[in-house]
Amino acid sequence: MIDGYSPVLQSLLGTLLTWGLTAAGSALVFIFSSGQRQILDGSLGFAAGVMLAASYWSLLAPAIEMAENSNQYGSFAFVPAAVGFLVGAGFVYLADQLMPALGFSEDPYSIATLNQDSKPIKEKDEGDLYEDKELSIRIGRGGFHQDKIENGDVYQRKRGTVSPLAEDFSMLNPREAAHKGGSSWRRIMLLILAITIHNIPEGLAVGVGFGAIGKTPSATFENARNLALGIGIQNFPEGLAVSLPLRGAGVSTWKAFWYGQLSGMVEPIAGLLGTIAISLAEPLLPYALAFAAGAMVYVVTDDIIPEAQACGNGKLASWTCIFGFIVMMSLDVGLG
C-alpha cells in the first residue's frame, strides 16, 4: 500500500497484507495448544470490534457522503447505503444457506482423518475405530452437529459410538474404499469452501475501498489503508480459529496451518475484482461500499461473536470487542 500508485496495485498490496496476517495467525498453531481457548475467544472479540468500526468509518460513511454529493437522491441519500447494506448481508446469508445443498449436512468426519490413506482398514486397525472418545470439529457456519458445541470447538462423543469411517470402510474392497476416499476429499474441499466464502466480502471491501479513493473527501488513501489494516487485524485470530480446532482434532500441525492460511487466499482475488468493477461502474460505488459493510457486519454478528461467546469466555470477548472497536475508530479518525 504505497500512496500514488494505481488502485489495482493498491488493492493487490492491501489484500496480500490481509492474507499474510491470516497466515500469521494460523501459524500460532505451532505455539498454542488446542486447549487455550481463552486466547482464541479474546482475539475473536477484538476482531469483531475492529470489523464493526471499519464497516462504518471506512465503508458506510463514505457511501452516504457519495450519495449526498451526487445530488441525485436529495433527502433520500441514505437509500444507496441501506440497499447495499441489506444486499451485502443477504449475500452472506444466501451463501450460508447454499452450504447444505453442496453436501455440508453430512458428518465431516474426514477432517479428523486427513492423514489416512484410502486403502481398506485391516482387522488389526479396526479396534482403533472404537476408542473411548472420538474427536471431531465444526468449522464455519455450516450446520454440522447441531446438538453439539458451537463452531470451531472440539467435541467428544460418548463411548460406544461406531466411527463413520468404520461403517464406510470396514466391509469395502480396495476399489470401493478408494471411491470412498475420493468422496472424503470432496467433502474436505467443500469444507475449505465454507471456511473461505465469508472472506470474499472482506477482500471486496478492500478492493472497493481503494477503488473509491478521491471520489469524495472521506474516500482517502488513508481510509482505504486503515480498512485493509483493520481487516488484516481481524484475519489474524481468524486464521488461528481455523487451524487450532483442526490441530485439536488430530490433524498434523503443518496441515492445520496450511488449511488455516488457505482461508485468506481468496481475498486478493476478490479485492482485484472489486477494484476493477468499481473503476468500470462508478455510479454503483455507494452501493458497493455499503454492500461490503453489510457483508462484514453479518459475518461479525452471525459468526465471530457467537463463536467467541460459545465457550464461557463471553465477558472477555465482549471487552476485547469494545477495545477492538476503539482501536479501529482511533485509526480511522486519527490517521484518516
From Swiss-Prot:
Record localization: Cell membrane; Nucleus; Cytoplasm; Golgi apparatus
Transmembrane segments: 12-32, 44-64, 75-95, 188-208, 258-278, 280-300, 316-336
Membrane topology: Multi-pass membrane protein
GO molecular-function term, one example from the UniProt record: zinc ion transmembrane transporter activity
Disulfide bonds: none
Cellular-component GO terms for this entry: cytoplasm; Golgi apparatus; nucleus; plasma membrane
Main location: membrane
Family annotation (InterPro entries): ZIP
UniProt entry tagged with the keyword Zinc: yes
Pfam families recorded: Zip
Keywords carried by this UniProt record: Cell membrane, Cytoplasm, Golgi apparatus, Ion transport, Membrane, Nucleus, Transmembrane, Transmembrane helix, Transport, Zinc, Zinc transport
Tree of life domain: Eukaryota
The keyword Transmembrane helix appears for this protein: yes
Record family assignment: Belongs to the ZIP transporter (TC 2.A.5) family.
Family matches, as PANTHER family: ZINC TRANSPORTER ZIP11, ZINC/IRON TRANSPORTER
Its job: Functions as a cellular zinc transporter.
Descriptive protein name: Zinc transporter ZIP11
Protein's gene: slc39a11
